[in-house]
């Protein structure tokens, strides 16, 4: 798992970061893990739309309730309407599975 985090930390372009974030999402533990959360959450706030979009997908693999604030921000104010829609769908999914912030 350390390799996945190192890949995110070492990414030098938005494309390489997006790929690393997706892999980190795939490899994230099902139980909340601060190290994975911090990196994916940062990607949800990235200036590049491609990174944010990939981070939204990464969240689907380990839907920690702690992602709700970032997803809500994307849903309410992201410049990309498609990304706003994806965040809305994911938040609805969180509601269905009972993933609420503690």
Spans of model-derived segments:
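Short, charged/polar micro-motifs that form catalytic or ligand-binding hotspots
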Residues: 10, 45, 57, 61
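Short inter-helical turns and helix N-cap capping residues of alpha-solenoid HEAT/ARM repeat scaffolds
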Residues: 12-13, 47-48, 79-84
